[in-house]
Amino acid sequence: MSSKDIVLAFSGGLDTSFCIPYLQERGYAVHTVFADTGGVDAEERDFIEKRAAELGAASHVTVDGGPAIWEGFVKPFVWAGEGYQGQYPLLVSDRYLIVDAALKRAEELGTRIIAHGCTGMGNDQVRFDLAVKALGDYQIVAPIREIQKEHTQTRAYEQKYLEERGFGVRAKQKAYTINENLLGVTMSGGEIDRWEAPGEGARGWCAPRSAWPTEALTVTLKFVEGEAVALDGKALPGAQILAKLNTLFAQYGVGRGVYTGDTVIGLKGRIVFEAPGLISLLTAHRALEDAVLTKQQNRFKPDVARKWVELVYEGFYHDPLKTDIEAFLKSSQSKVNGEVTLETRGGRVDAVAVRSPHLLNAKGATYAQSADWGVEEAEGFIKLFGMSSTLYAQVNR
């Protein structure tokens, strides 16, 4: 019987390593795809490719996911300007770009069968499956979910399964579950899951306070229609700007937090996250928006943005409503042009200067200092503006 081609989203970790022989023994020719979304170096990329070959993959491709993650997620996320439940900056949204890479490979191979290594307990399975289903009529195979029906200690089972077939398992044991990409780092497990204070081991990019530089860091970002296009006067692709911001602001411990929130499947989730570049980018963009958008725009946009963030978090990346909201967000950015200077001395980042041809500062008017209207006009405005509250007070004394 000839093997059926299947495309596996592959990371080289235990779960996806297990998937290759598991799928082969069920009649599949396994083609692996690694979408590099910024979480590995050249040495790790080389390991992943060799690991796929060692495990018997029929083919392996590595895809540069940096440009896609910038266009597909970072731009609209910065336009939205909101974290999930007001805090979490959606750091595993690269999953949608991984799905895109896997489906492109499936199209090249002429197969409609896709596999992933998600468990049956987390959010990622929802994001993977909904994204695949939204993009076509594909069969989804999830080996880890399948073995969880029969085995409670799945990782121990996976390790034994590989060892019995002569495949080694990486010796290093991690105290935490870590996700890392261009957007940032998330950590869970250990004392984090026990609702205790995270230990110093629960640290990825962000330097501890004791290691912060003594001199302040100042950088300038240039925006064109809401998109960062230059850093300190040098034009760069967006993904490179974000990578540089990660490096610069991580030294000062910027963008680190502990987040507790509601998962897609209804459980409470607790993680440590680090997003120095993304938080810095959001801070600069928000300062520019505050200066150039109208009062009504700045009031209304967060309501729409929250819905966009919820859709992305919950797996509805390809829902038409998300597309509709993005059209509004893009329209709102037509005047978000200018430069913002950021400064940090450690732990937080502030926008300390804004320059734009669209600043909404009326000529002759400076807040609380001077104005080109008279005292009588100010008194008349106050009287009319507060009329409803004044009448209520008079009637109900």
UniProtKB/Swiss-Prot annotation:
* InterPro entries on file: Arginosuc_syn_C, Arginosuc_syn_N, Arginosuc_synth, Arginosuc_synth_CS, Arginosuc_synth_type_1_subfam, AS_cat/multimer_dom_body, Rossmann-like_a/b/a_fold
Q: What domain of life is recorded for the organism?
A: Bacteria
Q: Which GO terms describe its molecular function?
A: argininosuccinate synthase activity; ATP binding
Gene3D superfamilies membership: Argininosuccinate synthetase, chain A, domain 2, HUPs
Pfam families to which the protein is assigned, alphabetical: Arginosuc_syn_C, Arginosuc_synth
> According to the UniProt entry, what is the EC number of this protein?
6.3.4.5
Give the main location: cytoplasm
Q: Does the keyword ATP-binding apply?
A: yes
What are its GO cellular component terms? cytoplasm
Q: Where in the cell is it found?
A: Cytoplasm
ATP-binding found in the keyword field: yes
* Associated pathway: Amino-acid biosynthesis; L-arginine biosynthesis; L-arginine from L-ornithine and carbamoyl phosphate: step 2/3
Identify the residues that bind ATP: 9-17, 35, 117
Indicate which residues the UniProt annotation says bind L-aspartate: 119, 123-124
What does the similarity note say? Belongs to the argininosuccinate synthase family. Type 1 subfamily.
Q: Which NCBIfam families match?
A: argG, PRK04527.1
Q: What is this protein called?
A: Argininosuccinate synthase
